[in-house]
A protein has these predicted regions:
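Alpha-helical linker/hinge and terminal dimerization helices associated
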Residues: 43-44, 66-88
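A short LG(V/I)-centered, amphipathic sequence patch enriched
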Residues: 41-61
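Beta-alpha-beta core module
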Residues: 155-161, 165-166, 228-277
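Secondary-structure junction motif
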Residues: 178, 193-214, 279-290, 295-307
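Flexible hinge/capping segments at coil-to-helix
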Residues: 157-194
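N-terminal short secondary-structure element
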Residues: 1-31, 36
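Short beta-strand-centered segments that line the small-molecule binding cleft or hinge
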Residues: 87, 110-114, 132-168, 172, ...
Length: 308
């Protein structure tokens, strides 16, 4: 058994059991991936993948357990490489951040600017997806750090640290009837079509919970994957928007009325997610601290390496 075989097993699962896509992701040929996986299965004496002809259809029961171990091994191999690089080129390398649109668009620009000034020779990569994808990318060693609100804490291969709390605002065209409400209520919001985030994104669960607690069902006319889309369709009068507060920009969004909704919804917490026991390069710790100044490197290390 070797790390290459382990890497290919992870790549096949992470690419929807498409061997050809896994080969592209690993910069190799499809027959190479298939051969390495078959060799590994023969060495272990167990079948990792369910097959239909030459196609991989999913994991066997044993394969589920093998994949969990393979993810850990693949992560450890990544940590070894990071350790070697940190010893030889502490201020050069690649840092991959997995995050959502709201974080990438409205929160991270300040951090990226600060980081790039300190580490001009580190290449930053932003992988944008939903929180579940962000967690999977870090768990599978495709990203170093995940930044999101939902889902990160649910992945057993990750540890998370709280960074900051935030809430929501309601946005509407300037002459919309909702703007005449002196104090917003769930009852008032329930009268109108709503535009908000998809269920997998940006604290949507808190919104659903607030409506349910008040005994109302939200009339969700449209769900979106990012804040800019919500604002676009509010401008088209499709509905009123429930938006992450940091996504409202007073100058650019002056044509929309912003109404505070923090009294209606429980606050959400944005977290960083890291792979358990992962070796992080020094510049990765610096990025986290720039993003969340309340965190200290020693605190981060304690959480990462306590999870054994």
């Amino acid at each position: 058994m070797n790390f290459q075989q382990v890497k290919f097993v992870c790549a096949v699962v992470e690419n929807g059991f498409s061997v050809s896509d896994a080969a592209v992701a690993c910069y190799t040929a499809q027959p190479v991936v298939s051969k390495h996986i078959k060799t590994l299965e023969d060495e272990l004496g167990l079948q990792i993948f369910e097959r239909r002809g030459k196609r991989f259809m999913g994991l066997t029961a044993a394969g589920e357990q093998a994949y969990a171990i393979a993810k850990r091994l693949n992560g450890d191999a990544t940590s070894l490489k990071a350790l070697a690089l940190d010893m030889t080129n502490a201020k050069e390398g690649v840092l991959t951040i997995a995050t959502t649109h709201t974080q990438a668009r409205y929160v991270l620009p300040r951090v990226v600017t600060q980081f790039s000034t300190k580490y001009p020779d580190v290449k930053l990569k932003l992988k944008q997806g939903n929180p579940k994808q962000c967690a999977d990318w870090v768990a599978g060693s495709e990203a170093d750090i995940a930044i999101a609100t939902e889902a990160l804490a649910l992945d057993p291969l990750l540890v998370t640290l709280p960074c900051y709390r935030w809430n929501r605002c309601v946005i509407a065209p300037l002459k919309h009837l909702i703007t005449k409400e002196k104090v917003l209520s769930i009852e008032a919001l329930a009268k109108y079509p709503l535009i908000t985030y998809d269920t997998a994104f940006t604290g949507r669960s808190q919104v659903d919970r607030a409506f349910a607690s008040a005994g109302f069902t939200p009339n969700v006319a449209l769900t979106a994957l990012d804040s800019d889309v919500i604002k676009t369709y509010v401008r088209l009068n499709v509905g009123i928007g429930i938006l992450a507060e940091m996504a409202y920009e007073p100058k650019l969004d002056a044509d929309l009325k912003r109404m505070d909704a923090s009294h209606l919804f429980a606050a959400s917490v944005t977290r960083v997610g890291l792979r358990k026991n992962a070796f992080l390069r020094r510049f990765a710790y610096d990025f986290i601290v720039m993003f969340a100044p309340s965190l200290k490197r020693t605190e981060i290390e304690e959480v990462v390496f306590a999870a054994r």
